[in-house]
Amino acid sequence: MNVAAGGPGTASASTTAANSIFNNSLLASATGATTMPMAQLADGWLELESDPGLFTLLLEDFGCHDVQVEEVYDLQKPIESPYGFIFLFRWIEERRARRKIVETTAEIFVKDEEAISSIFFAQQVVPNSCATHALLSVLLNCNENNLQLGDTLSRLKVHTKGMSPENKGLAIGNTPELACAHNSHAIPQARRRLERTGAGVASCRFTGEAFHFVSFVPISGQLFELDGLKPYPMNHGGWEDHEDWTDKFRRVMAERLGIATGEQDIRFNLMAVVPDRRIAITHKLKMLRTNQAIVSGTLQKLLKADEQGESGNGDQQRPDTPTTLLEPSAFTAKDLQLLLKNLDTEIAINEQNLADENDRRHMFKVDASRRTHNYDKFICTFLSMLAHQGVLGELVSQHLLPSKKVSGQSAANRISKQNSAASSAGANAGAAAGVTPKSQQQQQQPQTAASKNGKSPGKTPGRRRKGRNKCRKRK
């Protein structure tokens, strides 16, 4: 599913020009890299598809390696420790359901400047950048200590603190590291579409059907909705003491989808930004292997103590040998063996889960290579080789035949094959029974006439003469 961002809420050309000088000087300190105007960034910002693998690799390119993105298929299914949610929906300005949503969300706008500056809320002033905006809205509002943002995002968060939403959007749009990482995951068709339209900052508008990303994140005990095409962030309120913030999010999404689908269907996609599953699995494996070593060592000591007791050498035990775990009241050898077996099973399961996650991450990269590779040269070369060999015209004519004609020919071919098979089967059966088929009798008649003309004896001519004699007697 392609994403087309821009349109309503984008900055005008005059606003962008007025802020270009300020924006370039700002980013020199914000990113620590040589900056350039948006018009000089390679090809501008391109459309991205809504794919969790793409978003995960995009986060890695941003420098954030401890996070992944997962697609959510069931809102009722619990999700472990999400940082935030990204909601992709179809944007149609003229639709009634859209107006209902606007009327509903207008009541929860946060217009206090101090409250807005305390969070990371950036207006989308660059077309096709809503995917990056959605990811940054989740990550830069996360207060988790174990979340490593990386150098680029950390500098961006520090140097844009206290800025207006519009200036934050300009900072995102003119950060070369973000733009290059974003465009590296675009399909070749997106680049060609941008070249045909020549879309700029102010010229890219929503036309027909477009898709847009928004973020839902918990901030200071409140559920916020951050949409770069809205003038203000939206506060959906808090949640109960016995609830998790995801419960509040489920209620908001159920209400949102109920309004949007009241008159016609709406296509949407929901993704969750969560910690990298491999980190938790690796930590669990480390703990399980430590416990496995402890249980295995205790079991060996217990078995050794039993052997020494049976041989009468128990008094030779070293005084410094720990005996706490060897007491009968702790664990028996059978209990330790059962515990060790359970640990082995858990380790095998988690090793398989870790292998699956690594394979999944590898497939993300394979899919990204296939998605971003330009196959135009290969296709042109392949067609040229077919034409050079003289088979291209025949292949094209075969595939251009009407489907009915092809199906009729196929049916005729099937009937002809069935008749041939039936004839051969009948011939074989007749030969086995000593009966000559009718078709073979007709073929043998010329040979019979030839034998008659040659006056060779045969049963058939004798029968014919006998019949003629009977006719003469009747006369």
Curated annotation (Swiss-Prot):
Its EC number is 3.4.19.12. Residues 404-475 are annotated as: Positively charged C-terminal tail required for binding nucleosomes. It is found in: Nucleus. Pfam families: Peptidase_C12, UCH_C. It comes from the Eukaryota. Catalytic component of the polycomb repressive deubiquitinase (PR-DUB) complex, a complex that specifically mediates deubiquitination of histone H2A monoubiquitinated at 'Lys-119' (H2AK118ub1). Mediates bisymmetric organization of the PR-DUB complex and is involved in association with nucleosomes to mediate deubiquitination. Does not deubiquitinate monoubiquitinated histone H2B. Required to maintain the transcriptionally repressive state of homeotic genes throughout development. The PR-DUB complex has weak or no activity toward 'Lys-48'- and 'Lys-63'-linked polyubiquitin chains. This is Ubiquitin carboxyl-terminal hydrolase calypso. It comes from Drosophila persimilis (Fruit fly). The gene is caly.
